[in-house]
């Protein structure tokens, strides 16, 4: 009698337990959806057991991070341990001076980790340009996924305690849960301790029918944005343009920039939708992270709608700390520029990110100046004339796209080449041929922008429709969406863009 071979089974188990840099565990992968289904079955058993639930979620979160960054899950544990004890010290300290030194220690530890892993080679490159190539050797430093997100999240906890807005947690596991919670661990939204921590020890954990339905809707829309729109237009159009801009006409270069604007929105907001949706299925609420940003009529409005958790973090912990708008107009404009420069640097250690931040900082400062000197310029939303709002949306979108060109291009030479093609080799006569040649990509780009520009009430109607549908119908919709994803997805899993930050 021959026993069935089990090598294949154990190979798969070993693969599940092994870190592979080329195969991170991401929300849009079939593996994650399979593991999450099993995770939810066990999670439901801990509905009335807060401590067991906390430990179980922490273990899964650390496994999730291990599959993305390997041994560097220990860095996450170190960050949680460090700020847990520093926060207790800040709260216990009797003098303002001692509290200040402790919060500075927290900031130094967090920014020190970020600086080492993210900016060491950038600083070495600057030194080599100043003192000659070979002055310093580049280091082989691994960048842990999502380090910028959990560092900011951890700093907000100690700063809030220093400001007297929060009391420190008594249980280290609660803080590790807050910092490592897997739905938002690697790409946000950047959580706020005062909003999230009160939810940790719910007993019993409550997932209402509305929460469940909304969670399903957000997961499905996130999958659609990421796997069907973002990945497809990236692989089949946008990447080709940015890789070899001289091979394409100015129209194609412009379409590539517009395509990237949609790609990065669908990629990042798709992740945020899935993160918020998964959290809802677990009984936790996160605030909205995107609010149709390309409907913005001003750059200020854009930053109220784009990556809301980062823009509010920069406002509350950097811009206001610099003085905000309390120290005169010139200082206000300078604070905006500094905040956005550092926001650009937060995204990555490269000149292109600094220039991207400088562009947005200068635009925000100029818009604030414009509002100060032009009567009626503060009008927003429905108070604007329709033609004024339409013109504002067109101008703001193209300004943002100029920023995306710098953000996406691998070098400033690529920026120059694409702008040259747009202004000197547009080749409008080729537009019909280009559109027919990339029919699938252009159809998705058009559909994506049309869906994005639909009235908010249409989105709310769709959400209510899905969230109030019978469970069987929700399962059918989920299965249909997964089938569609399988039909259009590339052979290789495409990581989320913001994983690199």
Pin down the residues of each PLM region.
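Membrane-embedded transmembrane alpha-helical bundles that form the catalytic cores
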Residues: 2-451, 455-500
